[in-house]
Amino acid sequence: MKIIRAKDYQDMSRKAANIISAQVIMKPNCVLGLATGGTPVGTYAQLVDWYNKGDLDFSEVTTVNLDEYRGLPKEHPQSYWYFMNENLFSKVNIDPAKTNLPDGTNLDTAAECARYNGIIHKLGGIDLQLLGIGPNGHIGFNEPGEAFELETHCIDLAPTTIEANKRFFDGNEALVPKQAYTMGIKTIMQARKVLVVANGKAKAQAVKDAVTGPVTPACPGSILQLHPDCILVADEEALSLL
């Protein structure tokens, strides 16, 4: 795993956006795996800025997102489709038909997982997968204890993840969905390049465990030690325990 140090969140975002930009420029019809949450917001903002300056063209890019809450329609302001539309899709020239997320309204779990796996396989896999890492080491919604060999599946969210996400639901834990569709570790590991972004002291232990700890389902991010082309871009606080 290659580690790129950033001074702060803004620097982390710019460095991560540089790597994504290089992928888009080198292969205009690439498949980007995208992530949601607070960490990549700045990365998307930087990509939008470069697009507005004429430096990037997303017209041939296809995207597949890591995950989506089960039970939320895409129009819900806390759905991950809504997040992606607000932060990236509506602000660049990407073809909406080439943006893919799990369908949170499809409650037929087996059918939805098969559909999403089929999309990724038909695309020939993912060229670059962007990831955040949770305080408990989760990547996507692959929580501690998840088997490494899974593809897209439905997962019960860990209490720590529900707690972390309630800030997006007016602090009301009862409103936070308890399940999500997520790409599995197997799918993530099959991406040709993986880019992990992390910032802040709250992520320091997870980063330490993912980078230097044993490879174990107890810290899902630790599997990335075995990926042949994984880059971690993190600020000083997130790297403070290394």
Describe each PLM feature range:
Residues 46-57, 80, 144-153, 215:
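A glycine- and small-aliphatic-rich helix-loop capping segment at beta-alpha/alpha-beta transitions
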Residues 1-32:
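N-terminal glycine-/serine-/threonine-rich phosphate-binding loop
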Residues 183-186, 190-242:
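ATP/nucleoside-binding phosphotransfer catalytic cores, i.e., glycine-rich phosphate-binding loops
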Residues 33-37, 65, 102-103, 130-133, ...:
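Short beta-strand segments
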Residues 124-148:
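Glycine-rich phosphate-binding loop
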Residues 26-52:
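Glycine-rich N-terminal segment of FAD-binding domains in flavoprotein oxidoreductases
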Residues 140-185:
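Class I SAM-dependent methyltransferase SAM-binding "motif I" and its flanking Rossmann-like core
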Residues 56-129:
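Ligand-binding beta-strand-loop-alpha-helix segment within the catalytic cores
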